Amino acid sequence: MKRFLRLVSLTLLIMSTSGNTFAEEKVNVARQGTIRGRIVDTSKQILPGASIYIEKLHTGVTSDVNGYYTFANLTPGTYTVKVSYVGYSPVEMKITIPAGKTLEKDVVLNEGLELQEVVVGGAFQGQRRAINSQKNNLGITNVVSADQVGKFPDSNIGDALKRINGINVQYDQGEARFGQVRGTSADLSSVTINGNRLPSAEGDTRNVQLDLIPADMVQTIEVNKVVTSDMDGDAIGGSINLVTKSTPYKRMFSATAGTGYNWISQKAQLNLGFTYGDRFFNDKLGMMAAISYQNAPSGSDDVEFEYDVNKKGEVVMVEAQKRQYYVTRERQSYSLAFDYDINPNHRLTLQGIYNRRHDWENRYRVTYKDLDKTGLDDEGDMQQSAQIETKGGTPDNRNARLELQQTMDLSLSGEHQFGKLSVNWGASYARASEDRPNERYFSLKQDFLGFTVVDAGDRFPYVTTDVSLHNGEADGERGKWKVKELTESNQEIYEKDLKFKVDFELPLTNGIYGNSLRFGAKYASKTKDRNTLCYDYADTYKDTFDKDYMNNLTSQIRDGYMPGDQYKPTDFVSKEYLGSLDLSSMEGEQVLEESSGNYHARENVTSAFFRFDQNLGKKIKMMAGLRMEATHIKYNGWNWNVADDKDETETLEPTGNHKNSYVNWLPSLLFKYDVNDDLKLRASFTETLSRPKYSALIPCVNINRSDNELVMGNSDLTPTISYNLDLSADYYFKSVGLISAGIFYKKINDFIVDQVIGDYTYQNNEYKKFTQPKNAGDADLLGVELAYQRDFGFIAPALKCIGFYGTYTYTHTQVNNFNFEGRENEKDLSLPGSPEHTANASLYFEKKGFNVRFSYNY
């Protein structure tokens, strides 16, 4: 905080210096005027990304995400101002700038542009907004508006993101959860709300679960693939910014309702949405409120396999699982926004959003273990085993595992105009949490089995041997099913963020060689805690209830499970029986291994930046910037030790507090060349970073001498740094549409992955397996992006209601300087989590409110 106050003092000193400069030219400055306003269409919908240009001064600005624009430092007089927007008729108007005052001038554009008898109507409004924002942006940005999102059956932000060029997603239960930008892992990109990074409720990563936020709760999704100096620098892949619904230009109201059906759960889904906005007190006060509710019962069929390399160097299957999931996800989201125009030069904004997701899950799993042990042991016994497991919870949680995730973000900001100087400030508080109360597992195990695996080398192998809880009793004690696990855990993860920032913008000169300077400072304080407490009641259950579970079975692995008929129904302990057990009356043993992942971390990041924008004639714009980010982190965790004795005695000891500090300097240089009004070329160089996971930094030592395994944290981890080059060309059609191509290169240094070593010696003890996160080396990432979007009205006017949208991204990665012990000379390694191909295609029909789309995502 002290560092932030010093930065603010420095910026105030710069302001006072600037003030002295103004004083020297006080006559001219006093007479300078300002234009401020908002761009809307005839239905009073805001138009972000509109171009506002004064030909006489060769000066232009672009409306922001809420449609506002500001022209400062204008000599009094009368000017012709031109406002243009793709798909709208341009407007030219005479404006007289008053001396020393601010003129408020809103502009209304007429919907529909007649071009060779092709009329672009309101059905394509969302495309126009997105295309205008991309067209007028200095960097490389992809934009999706709310009404575009609404035309696809996307329930959450993650599903909406997968349709953007260069983005692929990781799924959970059929829904997009984490987003990956330009072939980088989800850890290497950031997710922000209104420019502030979202806290994460994930325990092991900084990732944000995108399926937590309903798609209908945002106004715009911006994917900034080039990060400029006025943005947070921790975004190697890119920055995904979610712009929440802002106050309207006039009263508006909307309500939506929808449904669906899931064939696995055999239940209907429900989607509801409500939005209301208005302005009060002679339009000085604006308000927007929105509510979203979704209830989605679903399910999934899942088979998973684990492989290893044997002593002969052969890849062999060691484990196979078949899983049946039944999941219900209920999302509630509430947002509220106010803005107040104190006068034409000063505006305050208050925004808040709260998201809440209940995730009730039951899982029924069969595990076939030790599949690589195909022969008999020295005693003539088969060496494979099976486990049957039920995952659930208590009756108050529907006898299911409840994962309750919540996020909230509350921000207060101000925009002020002091003569030539613009001042924007903001303060925000955000919190994310995940609660898993009374999560229960009931697992049964049978040993001395032998399985037959079919198609072991293919993508979908399967076990033909029948596994049943009713088998094995005739084989005596050795063949019986035994209670392996009966556990209940309670977990809480929460992260709190507090941020303050102040930015200044000073226009220096106007004209074809006009320029401006931006500078500012930011302070972000983050705390994160993970607390898990787990007890095992298996021994007490066996002594008390013996085989009572056999009277409470349910048949799962449903009919129609996966393609084919090779998967047979299996009996499991029912979720109702598992939930009914009174574990509070049983004596349980704490599972210290689960608590060994607990930690506390506090991170403070102080940053400052400057950004210089320069026009190099009428067609070329340049932006040069530098950002400094100083990071200080303090953390502690736990060491877990399992003794190699008869009782396998466990201990848990605190690691103590550890600290780490570092400073990063992040330069950026961007160019944009307007070949003409429709063809735009962009080039940029930027430097970005990605900070290590909190859980990876904890200097814990977890020793399991029973299994002879060692897991360690690594407090010496350094941030991953990336040097980024981008080139792109975009052509924008007069009617709504574009064609674009781009190439990008990233030189990524010190990427982090887990190192796994066999037969590892630590403190004179040898361990079968050693795992530790490590800065593994460097990587080159090269990619190509292509996109095409257009309606078919250019072929024939009657086809204007039909269009096509398609994207394709290719990425290739190559690891260099790989420093894992014993693997230094390995070649042809790719960056973890990097897909080679991603693609989207959509053929659509839109006419008179009727919308049909056929979409494909790869």
Locations of regions flagged by a protein language model:
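Extracytoplasmic beta-strand/coil segments of soluble accessory domains associated
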Residues: 158-197
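Outer-membrane beta-barrel signature, preferentially recognizing the C-terminal barrel domain
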Residues: 390-409, 593, 597-606, 660, ...
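Short, acidic, small-residue-rich periplasmic hinge/interaction motif at the N-terminus
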Residues: 25-32, 38-45, 50-55, 84-88, ...
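Transmembrane beta-barrel wall of Gram-negative outer-membrane proteins
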Residues: 266-370, 395, 405-412, 419, ...
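N-terminal periplasmic accessory domains that precede
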Residues: 104-107, 157-160, 177-180, 192, ...
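Short acidic/polar hinge/loop motifs at secondary-structure boundaries
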Residues: 72, 197-225
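Short, acidic Ser/Thr/Gly-rich low-complexity loop/linker segments typical of extracellular
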Residues: 57-68
